[in-house]
């Protein structure tokens, strides 16, 4: 965890970014890099405090490299600790220094896909009490005091139980953190100004897959044999539902490097990637969101998650008068 720096803004750092605090809640290691890697790298580079909370260690993931197959849950069951290290590598690539696991590393276990027996095993995140899990996140919210929260939609983007549960826990914690009557021992109340869900506009996905199909038709151009489908992309919605578009083209390399750090789960061949199913899909450097709580300035798409939220002056930071 890193405090706000005490020196002046770095060259090129917009003054308004100083004092901005972004909290992201994800289900497993790798979700943050796939969904928000460019966003995280951009805001971290611009001087915002970026905090990631990951809810499980991703113990039930499928392992891609044959040399690491022994990590799988049906063999050594050591994938979780290995993915902790992968996540640390990804955070380094994104320039993010504040990462926590919900309730501490290993407090909640990956639940596996919907309908499998792992959903109900002791400690599975899917079977956790939402208020109990949310209390762990309330502690983080009241400590970090983020103006912006990013998480999944109610379906978790694609129906994975841990993603759905992460949504429930994040939204519940956002409400409880602002309630002065809830657990005063967890810190002073804090009301998050803006809450976003991860989204991808259908038009962008269709365009990306059309480009992918053309590239697949040229032998040797793409190292993957087959394309995924639009339904394999989490959070795809009609274009009009997207309220916010973060241009991360300047951080595309950082996002790709962070995804590569999750080598047990992702294969990257820019501008495409594949998961354990080996089905290629576009790697997007521009990332999209739907504002579900908070004020939106004007009717056009936002280009900044902190739009309408002032930063703090350098003098305030030096004097210690800012939160």
UniProtKB/Swiss-Prot annotation:
GO biological process terms held by the UniProt record: mycothiol biosynthetic process
Keywords: Hydrolase, Metal-binding, Zinc
An MF annotation (GO) of this entry: N-acetylglucosaminylinositol deacetylase activity
Cofactor binding description: Binds 1 zinc ion per subunit.
E.C. designation(s): 3.5.1.103
Job of this protein: Catalyzes the deacetylation of 1D-myo-inositol 2-acetamido-2-deoxy-alpha-D-glucopyranoside (GlcNAc-Ins) in the mycothiol biosynthesis pathway.
Reaction(s) the record says it catalyses: 1D-myo-inositol 2-acetamido-2-deoxy-alpha-D-glucopyranoside + H2O = 1D-myo-inositol 2-amino-2-deoxy-alpha-D-glucopyranoside + acetate
Protein's gene: mshB
PANTHER family per the UniProt record, alphabetical: 1D-MYO-INOSITOL 2-ACETAMIDO-2-DEOXY-ALPHA-D-GLUCOPYRANOSIDE DEACETYLASE, N-ACETYLGLUCOSAMINYL-PHOSPHATIDYLINOSITOL DE-N-ACETYLASE-RELATED
Gene3D superfamilies: LmbE-like
The protein's name: 1D-myo-inositol 2-acetamido-2-deoxy-alpha-D-glucopyranoside deacetylase
Highest taxon, organism lineage: Bacteria
Sequence positions that bind Zn(2+): 28, 31, 163
Biological source species: Streptomyces scabiei (strain 87.22)
Family of this protein: Belongs to the MshB deacetylase family.
Name of the top EC class for this enzyme: hydrolase
Listed cofactors: Zn(2+)
Keyword Transmembrane helix: no
């Amino acid at each position: 965890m890193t405090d706000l720096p005490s020196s002046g803004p770095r060259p090129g750092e917009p003054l308004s970014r100083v004092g901005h605090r972004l909290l992201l809640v994800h289900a497993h290691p790798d979700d943050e890099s796939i969904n928000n890697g460019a966003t995280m790298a951009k805001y971290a580079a611009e001087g915002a405090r970026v905090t990631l909370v990951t809810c499980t260690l991703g113990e039930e993931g499928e392992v891609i490299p044959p040399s690491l197959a022994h990590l799988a849950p049906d063999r050594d069951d050591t994938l979780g600790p290995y993915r902790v290290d992968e996540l640390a590598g990804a955070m380094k690539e994104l320039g993010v220094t504040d990462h926590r696991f919900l309730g501490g590393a290993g407090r909640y276990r990956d639940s596996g896909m919907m309908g499998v027996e792992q959903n109900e095993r002791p400690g599975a995140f899917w079977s956790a009490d939402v208020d109990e899990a949310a209390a762990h996140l309330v502690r983080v919210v009241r400590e970090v005091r983020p103006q912006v929260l990013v998480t999944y939609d109610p379906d978790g983007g694609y129906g994975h139980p841990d993603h759905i549960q992460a949504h429930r826990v994040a939204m519940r914690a956002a409400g409880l953190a602002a309630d002065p009557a809830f657990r005063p021992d967890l810190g002073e109340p804090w009301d998050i100004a803006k809450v976003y869900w991860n989204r991808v506009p259908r038009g962008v996905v269709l365009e990306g897959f059309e480009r992918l199909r053309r590239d697949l038709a040229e032998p040797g151009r793409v190292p993957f044999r087959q394309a995924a489908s639009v339904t394999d992309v989490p959070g795809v919605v009609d274009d009009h539902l997207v309220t916010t578009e973060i241009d991360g083209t300047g951080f595309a390399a950082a996002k790709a490097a962070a995804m590569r750090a999750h080598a047990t789960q992702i294969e990257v061949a820019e501008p495409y990637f594949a998961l354990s199913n080996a089905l290629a899909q576009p790697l997007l450097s521009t990332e999209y969101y739907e504002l579900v709580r908070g004020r939106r300035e004007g009717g056009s798409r936002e280009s900044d998650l902190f739009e309408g939220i002032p930063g703090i002056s350098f003098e305030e930071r030096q004097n210690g008068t800012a939160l």
